[in-house]
């Protein structure tokens, strides 16, 4: 008989109220997250999802004063009666604004910041810093300053900086907020790769559901008005109307299936476009719906407002950020 794992994060009848507010932001939270899981916590703006994350890493109530009720244990620690310092040894947090997390003058200094604070010997510090940088693919940028990095690269540095402590839990607070779709996919791929290599527990706080589902997650926890409305697998949640009912845009291919009149069930595996199971009747419905859509006629040649031809640019002579970019934008 397989022994059941104990949760690494456990909320029991938990609520949190900021000192400056009259009502609790979180109420009646019951949630268990197990070692090695990757869990997406989704919800519209103001739903309480970031407050929930702040309770896990200790920002609430130690940096943002407030009152906790119920119990919350994080890797065996009684979180509300602990400290940010103690919880930081268990939870590594990557903020939505990497600039607010950048401390060092260079990438290498920033990654090594926690090691310096713990008086790690120089030789060991260099080795750990190099290993963390290689893990996130930033090892060739250790001498770069913050302003020389893209948003995605800064996020990699932040991730490397929290990984030097070998934490068991990685928390990403809206990691896609400042990234374009392409960089967002790269960020999700990186999170997935790191989780597989290190077997850490990963929490992703995000409302851009389709982008997060670019790689698999074990569960989606839907939060709104400070309460947990759903705790399901992606396939289960996408076969309901809960996302749309609570202001979260479901993946566009799922919306297209609904418009075509397809009955979406968890058996159809709607969590990823490449895994969707459609029978012949479903395919016919989708094709008929697609062919019924009006085709926009070409308006002919338009006045060009912006035109770029073969543009290259680099912050340094040795590294080009843009290479032979050509584009035009019409009026």
Residues of each region from the PLM?
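Conserved ABC transporter NBD signature motif
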Residues: 65-77
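Short helical segment in ABC ATPase nucleotide-binding domains corresponding to the A-loop/adjacent helical element
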Residues: 57, 92, 99, 105-116, ...
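Catalytic Walker B motif of ABC-type/P-loop ATPase nucleotide-binding domains
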Residues: 170-174
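Conserved ABC ATPase signature
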Residues: 145-149, 153
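Conserved ABC ATPase "signature" region
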Residues: 123-141, 306
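Conserved ABC ATPase "signature" C-loop
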Residues: 225-226
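ABC ATPase C-loop
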Residues: 162-163
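ABC ATPase NBD coupling module
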Residues: 78-92, 237-238
């Amino acid at each position: 008989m397989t022994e059941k794992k104990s949760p690494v994060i456990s909320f029991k009848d938990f609520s949190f109220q900021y000192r400056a507010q009259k009502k609790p932001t979180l109420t009646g939270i019951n949630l268990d997250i197990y070692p090695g899981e990757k869990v997406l916590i989704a919800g519209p703006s103001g739903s309480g999802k970031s407050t929930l994350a702040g309770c896990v890493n200790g920002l609430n109530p130690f940096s943002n004063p407030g009152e906790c009720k119920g119990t919350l244990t994080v890797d065996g620690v009684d979180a509300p009666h602990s400290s940010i310092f103690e919880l930081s040894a268990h939870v590594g947090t990557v903020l939505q604004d990497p600039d607010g997390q950048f401390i060092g003058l260079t990438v290498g200094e920033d990654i090594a910041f926690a090691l310096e604070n713990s008086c790690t010997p120089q030789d060991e510090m260099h080795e750990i810093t190099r290993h963390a940088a290689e893990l996130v693919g930033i090892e060739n940028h250790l001498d770069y300053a913050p302003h020389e990095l893209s948003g995605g690269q800064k996020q990699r540095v932040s991730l490397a900086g929290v990984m030097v402590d070998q934490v068991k839990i990685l928390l990403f607070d809206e990691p896609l907020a400042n990234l374009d779709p392409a960089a967002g996919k790269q960020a999700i791929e990186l999170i997935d790769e790191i989780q597989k290599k290190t077997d850490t527990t990963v929490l992703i706080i995000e409302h851009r559901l389709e982008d997060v589902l670019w790689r698999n997650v074990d569960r989606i926890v839907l939060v709104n008005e400070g309460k947990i409305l759903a705790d399901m697998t992606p396939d289960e949640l996408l076969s309901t109307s809960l996302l749309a009912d609570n202001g979260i845009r479901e993946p566009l291919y799922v919306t297209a299936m609904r418009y075509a009149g397809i009955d979406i069930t968890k058996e159809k595996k709607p969590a990823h476009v490449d895994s969707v199971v459609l029978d012949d009747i479903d395919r016919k419905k989708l094709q008929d719906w697609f062919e019924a859509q009006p085709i926009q006629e070409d308006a002919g040649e338009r006045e060009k407002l912006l035109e770029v031809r073969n543009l290259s640019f680099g912050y340094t002579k040795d590294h080009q950020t843009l290479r032979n970019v050509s584009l035009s934008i019409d009026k």
